[in-house]
Amino acid sequence: IAPARSASDIDEAVLARAQTALESLSLKVSFSQYAFSRSQRGCPTDVEKVDDLHAAFLDPNVKGVLAAIGGVNSNQLLGRIDWDIIRANPKIFAGFSDITVLNHAILAKTGLVTFATPNFYCFGLPPKADYSLEYFRCCLFAGQPETYRVRASKVFYDYAWDYDEKS
């Protein structure tokens, strides 16, 4: 889903690499109805974002919800979200950046533990993608969090918005 910026802001090659990376974990990747939508603000409307969030939690075939990209305005969704839908249909919710407000709100309103993970696009950005994918797998698929130790990444980027093919 794209609860902040539109997934259409992500370079197509990065999208393809991210999808391939997540599929290497035997995940079936699908995109929400409005993930690539662009309103006058350049992203899905708040109604579209919330519709996608609700649809993802209501769909029994969806096992986890991963934000496409961070951005702005996720806080504007809080008053529109039906927390009972999320509470009644618990599943993995993951992302970071502007998505952090949703991580915290979901925990506060429903008790569902969420995950501060790379957003979808991050898994398509080499050389960071390998490190991110390794710990995404460990965190979500390898048992209890205390069963693995996080090592420092050898790659660090000190600039914002490194989500395109040139990065």
Describe the predicted segments one by one.
Residues 1-61:
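ATP/NTP phosphate-donor binding region
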Residues 45-54, 107, 115, 132:
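Cofactor- and metal-binding active-site motifs of prokaryotic enzymes
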Residues 62-68, 90-93:
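A short, small-residue-rich loop immediately preceding and capping a beta-strand
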Residues 66-75, 80, 96:
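N-terminal glycine-rich "phosphate-gripper" loop used for MgATP/nucleotide binding
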Residues 77-78, 105-108, 126-129:
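Short acidic, glycine/serine/threonine-rich loops at helix termini
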Residues 81-106, 113-120:
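Short, acidic/small-residue loops that bind anionic groups at enzyme active sites
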Residues 111-167:
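Conserved anion/nucleotide-ligand pocket segment
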